[in-house]
Protein backbone atom coordinates (compact mmCIF):
# COMPACT_ATOMS: atom_id res chain seq x y z
CA UNK A 1 0.00 0.00 0.00
CA UNK A 2 2.86 2.37 0.85
CA UNK A 3 4.52 1.76 -2.53
CA UNK A 4 1.37 2.74 -4.45
CA UNK A 5 0.75 5.89 -2.40
CA UNK A 6 1.10 9.06 -4.47
CA UNK A 7 0.31 11.70 -1.84
CA UNK A 8 1.91 13.05 1.32
CA UNK A 9 -0.93 12.20 3.71
CA UNK A 10 -0.90 9.35 6.20
CA UNK A 11 -3.66 6.79 5.76
CA UNK A 12 -3.68 5.01 9.11
CA UNK A 13 -3.95 1.23 9.35
CA UNK A 14 -6.91 -0.44 11.09
CA UNK A 15 -6.50 -0.07 14.85
CA UNK A 16 -8.27 -1.58 17.88
CA UNK A 17 -7.60 1.46 20.07
CA UNK A 18 -10.63 3.62 19.16
CA UNK A 19 -13.08 0.88 20.14
CA UNK A 20 -11.09 -0.02 23.27
CA UNK A 21 -11.03 3.65 24.30
CA UNK A 22 -14.79 3.85 23.75
CA UNK A 23 -15.38 0.77 25.90
CA UNK A 24 -13.14 2.23 28.61
CA UNK A 25 -15.08 5.50 28.52
CA UNK A 26 -18.38 3.60 28.75
CA UNK A 27 -17.17 1.58 31.73
CA UNK A 28 -15.87 4.73 33.43
CA UNK A 29 -19.15 6.57 32.94
CA UNK A 30 -21.40 3.72 34.06
CA UNK A 31 -19.06 2.83 36.93
CA UNK A 32 -18.94 6.46 38.06
CA UNK A 33 -22.73 6.72 38.16
CA UNK A 34 -23.01 3.40 40.00
CA UNK A 35 -20.35 4.46 42.51
CA UNK A 36 -22.01 7.82 43.22
CA UNK A 37 -25.34 6.04 43.83
CA UNK A 38 -23.71 3.37 46.04
CA UNK A 39 -24.46 0.45 43.70
CA UNK A 40 -22.46 -2.70 44.32
CA UNK A 41 -19.54 -3.08 41.90
CA UNK A 42 -19.53 0.59 40.92
CA UNK A 43 -16.05 1.29 42.27
CA UNK A 44 -14.66 -1.81 40.55
CA UNK A 45 -16.19 -0.92 37.19
CA UNK A 46 -14.99 2.69 37.52
CA UNK A 47 -11.44 1.54 38.31
CA UNK A 48 -11.39 -0.92 35.41
CA UNK A 49 -12.68 1.75 33.03
CA UNK A 50 -9.98 4.22 34.08
CA UNK A 51 -7.26 1.56 33.76
CA UNK A 52 -8.57 0.64 30.30
CA UNK A 53 -8.53 4.29 29.20
CA UNK A 54 -4.99 4.83 30.50
CA UNK A 55 -3.78 1.66 28.78
CA UNK A 56 -5.43 2.69 25.51
CA UNK A 57 -3.85 6.14 25.70
CA UNK A 58 -0.40 4.63 26.28
CA UNK A 59 -0.49 2.09 23.44
CA UNK A 60 -2.21 4.48 21.00
CA UNK A 61 0.38 7.22 21.52
CA UNK A 62 3.10 4.56 21.35
CA UNK A 63 1.84 3.62 17.89
CA UNK A 64 1.75 7.28 16.81
CA UNK A 65 5.38 7.67 17.87
CA UNK A 66 6.32 4.54 15.94
CA UNK A 67 4.55 5.80 12.83
CA UNK A 68 6.37 9.10 13.15
CA UNK A 69 9.86 8.12 14.30
CA UNK A 70 10.39 4.66 12.83
CA UNK A 71 8.07 4.47 9.81
CA UNK A 72 8.34 8.06 8.56
CA UNK A 73 4.62 8.58 7.99
CA UNK A 74 4.59 12.11 9.43
CA UNK A 75 5.38 14.17 6.35
CA UNK A 76 5.25 17.97 6.31
CA UNK A 77 1.58 17.82 5.33
CA UNK A 78 0.79 15.46 8.21
CA UNK A 79 2.73 17.63 10.65
CA UNK A 80 0.78 20.69 9.51
CA UNK A 81 -2.49 18.84 10.09
CA UNK A 82 -1.36 17.84 13.58
CA UNK A 83 -0.52 21.46 14.36
CA UNK A 84 -3.94 22.64 13.18
CA UNK A 85 -5.61 19.92 15.22
CA UNK A 86 -3.75 20.86 18.37
CA UNK A 87 -4.55 24.54 17.89
CA UNK A 88 -8.25 23.63 17.72
CA UNK A 89 -7.82 21.55 20.87
CA UNK A 90 -6.35 24.57 22.69
CA UNK A 91 -9.28 26.69 21.45
CA UNK A 92 -11.65 24.15 23.01
CA UNK A 93 -9.67 24.41 26.25
CA UNK A 94 -10.05 28.20 26.15
CA UNK A 95 -13.83 27.73 25.99
CA UNK A 96 -13.61 25.27 28.88
CA UNK A 97 -11.93 27.79 31.18
CA UNK A 98 -14.13 30.59 29.84
CA UNK A 99 -17.06 28.84 31.52
CA UNK A 100 -15.34 28.99 34.92
CA UNK A 101 -14.45 32.66 34.52
CA UNK A 102 -18.03 33.37 33.47
CA UNK A 103 -19.33 31.70 36.65
CA UNK A 104 -16.85 33.66 38.76
CA UNK A 105 -17.61 37.09 37.29
CA UNK A 106 -21.35 36.40 37.18
CA UNK A 107 -21.26 35.76 40.93
CA UNK A 108 -18.75 38.44 41.93
CA UNK A 109 -19.96 41.41 39.88
CA UNK A 110 -23.55 41.08 41.13
CA UNK A 111 -23.43 39.21 44.47
CA UNK A 112 -26.81 37.96 45.65
CA UNK A 113 -28.43 38.39 49.05
CA UNK A 114 -27.71 34.73 49.86
CA UNK A 115 -24.00 35.57 50.19
CA UNK A 116 -24.56 38.89 51.96
CA UNK A 117 -24.62 41.07 48.85
CA UNK A 118 -20.83 41.45 48.99
CA UNK A 119 -17.79 39.83 47.40
CA UNK A 120 -15.99 37.91 48.77
CA UNK A 121 -19.04 36.45 50.51
CA UNK A 122 -19.58 37.23 54.16
CA UNK A 123 -17.60 34.91 56.42
CA UNK A 124 -15.07 33.83 53.77
CA UNK A 125 -11.41 34.35 54.64
CA UNK A 126 -9.57 34.78 51.35
CA UNK A 127 -5.96 33.91 50.54
CA UNK A 128 -3.30 36.61 50.35
CA UNK A 129 -2.41 36.92 46.63
CA UNK A 130 1.08 38.24 47.44
CA UNK A 131 2.25 35.08 49.19
CA UNK A 132 2.07 31.61 47.59
CA UNK A 133 -0.01 32.76 44.56
CA UNK A 134 2.59 35.38 43.57
CA UNK A 135 5.43 32.90 44.12
CA UNK A 136 3.63 30.32 41.99
CA UNK A 137 3.14 32.95 39.28
CA UNK A 138 6.89 33.59 39.14
CA UNK A 139 7.61 29.85 39.13
CA UNK A 140 5.18 29.15 36.29
CA UNK A 141 6.45 32.07 34.21
CA UNK A 142 10.00 30.81 34.76
CA UNK A 143 8.95 27.38 33.53
CA UNK A 144 7.50 29.02 30.41
CA UNK A 145 10.85 30.72 29.81
CA UNK A 146 12.62 27.37 30.30
CA UNK A 147 10.44 25.59 27.73
CA UNK A 148 11.13 28.43 25.27
CA UNK A 149 14.84 27.92 25.96
CA UNK A 150 14.37 24.23 25.13
CA UNK A 151 12.65 25.13 21.86
CA UNK A 152 15.48 27.41 20.78
CA UNK A 153 18.00 24.70 21.72
CA UNK A 154 16.18 22.15 19.55
CA UNK A 155 16.08 24.57 16.61
CA UNK A 156 19.82 25.19 17.05
CA UNK A 157 20.55 21.44 17.11
CA UNK A 158 21.86 21.54 20.69
CA UNK A 159 20.36 18.32 22.02
CA UNK A 160 21.93 18.27 25.50
CA UNK A 161 20.96 21.87 26.17
CA UNK A 162 17.38 21.07 25.16
CA UNK A 163 17.31 18.17 27.63
CA UNK A 164 18.63 20.41 30.43
CA UNK A 165 15.99 23.03 29.64
CA UNK A 166 13.21 20.43 29.70
CA UNK A 167 14.46 19.06 33.03
CA UNK A 168 14.37 22.61 34.43
CA UNK A 169 10.83 23.08 33.11
CA UNK A 170 9.62 19.85 34.70
CA UNK A 171 11.27 20.64 38.05
CA UNK A 172 9.64 24.08 38.14
CA UNK A 173 6.29 22.48 37.26
CA UNK A 174 6.64 20.02 40.14
CA UNK A 175 7.48 22.85 42.55
CA UNK A 176 4.40 24.76 41.34
CA UNK A 177 2.18 21.72 41.89
CA UNK A 178 3.63 21.19 45.37
CA UNK A 179 2.97 24.79 46.40
CA UNK A 180 -0.55 24.58 44.99
CA UNK A 181 -1.23 21.50 47.07
CA UNK A 182 0.15 23.28 50.15
CA UNK A 183 -2.13 26.23 49.45
CA UNK A 184 -5.17 23.95 49.22
CA UNK A 185 -4.23 22.29 52.51
CA UNK A 186 -3.91 25.65 54.29
CA UNK A 187 -6.92 27.36 52.66
CA UNK A 188 -9.40 28.72 55.26
CA UNK A 189 -12.37 27.65 53.10
CA UNK A 190 -13.48 24.56 51.20
CA UNK A 191 -15.20 23.85 47.90
CA UNK A 192 -18.56 23.76 49.73
CA UNK A 193 -18.15 27.24 51.25
CA UNK A 194 -20.48 29.29 49.06
CA UNK A 195 -20.03 30.13 45.39
CA UNK A 196 -16.59 31.57 46.17
CA UNK A 197 -15.22 28.22 47.30
CA UNK A 198 -16.86 26.42 44.39
CA UNK A 199 -15.49 28.71 41.67
CA UNK A 200 -12.07 28.98 43.33
CA UNK A 201 -11.44 25.26 43.66
CA UNK A 202 -13.00 24.37 40.31
CA UNK A 203 -11.02 26.96 38.35
CA UNK A 204 -7.68 26.52 40.12
CA UNK A 205 -8.18 22.77 40.49
CA UNK A 206 -8.76 22.19 36.80
CA UNK A 207 -5.79 24.43 36.06
CA UNK A 208 -3.71 22.27 38.40
CA UNK A 209 -4.95 19.18 36.58
CA UNK A 210 -3.81 20.72 33.30
CA UNK A 211 -0.42 21.49 34.86
CA UNK A 212 -0.04 17.81 35.80
CA UNK A 213 -1.00 16.70 32.27
CA UNK A 214 1.41 19.24 30.78
CA UNK A 215 4.17 18.03 33.10
CA UNK A 216 3.70 14.45 31.91
CA UNK A 217 3.67 15.72 28.32
CA UNK A 218 7.00 17.51 28.87
CA UNK A 219 8.53 14.47 30.60
CA UNK A 220 7.76 12.36 27.53
CA UNK A 221 9.27 15.07 25.31
CA UNK A 222 12.37 15.14 27.50
CA UNK A 223 12.80 11.37 27.24
CA UNK A 224 12.35 11.48 23.46
CA UNK A 225 14.83 14.34 23.19
CA UNK A 226 17.34 12.37 25.28
CA UNK A 227 16.89 9.36 22.98
CA UNK A 228 17.47 11.55 19.92
CA UNK A 229 13.98 11.10 18.49
CA UNK A 230 13.42 14.81 17.80
CA UNK A 231 15.28 17.02 15.32
CA UNK A 232 15.17 20.70 14.47
CA UNK A 233 12.93 19.89 11.50
CA UNK A 234 10.76 17.26 13.13
CA UNK A 235 9.55 18.02 16.67
CA UNK A 236 5.79 18.46 16.41
CA UNK A 237 5.26 16.67 19.72
CA UNK A 238 7.46 19.16 21.52
CA UNK A 239 5.75 22.10 19.80
CA UNK A 240 2.38 20.82 21.00
CA UNK A 241 3.72 20.45 24.55
CA UNK A 242 5.21 23.97 24.46
CA UNK A 243 1.97 25.50 23.15
CA UNK A 244 0.02 23.66 25.83
CA UNK A 245 2.41 24.89 28.52
CA UNK A 246 2.19 28.50 27.39
CA UNK A 247 -1.61 28.15 27.43
CA UNK A 248 -1.39 26.93 31.03
CA UNK A 249 0.77 29.98 31.84
CA UNK A 250 -1.75 32.41 30.35
CA UNK A 251 -4.68 30.79 32.17
CA UNK A 252 -2.81 31.10 35.45
CA UNK A 253 -2.19 34.81 34.87
CA UNK A 254 -5.94 35.32 34.39
CA UNK A 255 -6.62 33.27 37.53
CA UNK A 256 -4.12 35.27 39.56
CA UNK A 257 -5.42 38.66 38.45
CA UNK A 258 -9.15 37.87 38.60
CA UNK A 259 -9.66 35.35 41.41
CA UNK A 260 -6.68 35.84 43.71
CA UNK A 261 -6.10 39.58 43.37
CA UNK A 262 -9.28 41.34 42.20
CA UNK A 263 -11.65 38.72 43.62
CA UNK A 264 -9.98 38.81 47.02
CA UNK A 265 -10.19 42.56 47.58
Swiss-Prot record:
Where does it sit, as one GO cellular component term? mitochondrial inner membrane
The residues forming a coiled coil are none
User: Where found in the cell?
Assistant: Mitochondrion inner membrane
- The top EC class, named as a word, is translocase
Membrane-protein topology? Multi-pass membrane protein
Q: Organism's domain of life? A: Eukaryota
Catalytic activity entry:
4 Fe(II)-[cytochrome c] + O2 + 8 H(+)(in) = 4 Fe(III)-[cytochrome c] + 2 H2O + 4 H(+)(out)
| UniProt name for this protein | Cytochrome c oxidase subunit 3
Q: Which organism is it from?
A: Triticum aestivum
Q: What is the lineage of its organism?
A: Eukaryota, Viridiplantae, Streptophyta, Embryophyta, Tracheophyta
Amino acid sequence: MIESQRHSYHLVDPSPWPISGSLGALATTVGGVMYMHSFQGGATLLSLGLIFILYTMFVWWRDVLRESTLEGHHTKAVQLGLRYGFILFIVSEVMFFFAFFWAFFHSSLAPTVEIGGIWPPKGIGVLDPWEIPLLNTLILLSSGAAVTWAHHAILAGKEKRAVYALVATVLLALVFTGFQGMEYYQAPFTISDSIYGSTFFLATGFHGFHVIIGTLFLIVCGIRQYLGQMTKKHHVGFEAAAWYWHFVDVVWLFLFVSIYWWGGI
